[in-house]
Amino acid sequence: EFVDSYLPYLLARASFSISNEFHAQVEAAGFTVSEWRILASLSGVKQRTVGELADIVLAKQPTVTKMVLRMASEDLVMRTPCTQDKRQAWVSITPKGQKLVKPLLKKAALHEKNVLSSLGEPQSQALKSILQKLFKQSN
């Protein structure tokens, strides 16, 4: 069958099945998938712009702006105006946000390890490398 060897379908199906398993844990922790992606992408970095976050969480910038404002009201993130470009805002994770996302980061790493366990380390790294190349090529 065509779809059984069609790359976009295979990628979408793999993403759907792998992500759904972990997204249940995200929702059990009280976050939406987009909130999880925002917190995870801010963990370990000083700050990101709303535009960068929109690219990472695969959402439109106005949607991410609304999420960031709501998350800031819950003290999960902090929004700071950009001094170079008044249209932009910097977003950073708060200590509360970091504390809440830390257990999920550990669960995500364990989930990834379990998903990739049948491949072994060389194939796992090769798969990630190939996916990163495809992503860069398409952008």
Predicted regions and their residues:
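N-terminal leader segment of winged-helix/HTH proteins
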Residues: 1-29, 76
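Charged, amphipathic alpha-helical coiled-coil/dimerization segments
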Residues: 19, 69-132
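Short alpha-helical "packing" element that flanks the helix-turn-helix/winged-helix DNA-binding module
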Residues: 38-39
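Short capping segments at the starts of secondary-structure elements
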Residues: 45-49
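Alpha-helical transmembrane segments and membrane-interface helix-loop junctions
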Residues: 50, 132, 136-139
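Residues within helix-turn-helix
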Residues: 50-51, 62, 69, 89
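The alpha-helix within a helix-turn-helix
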Residues: 54
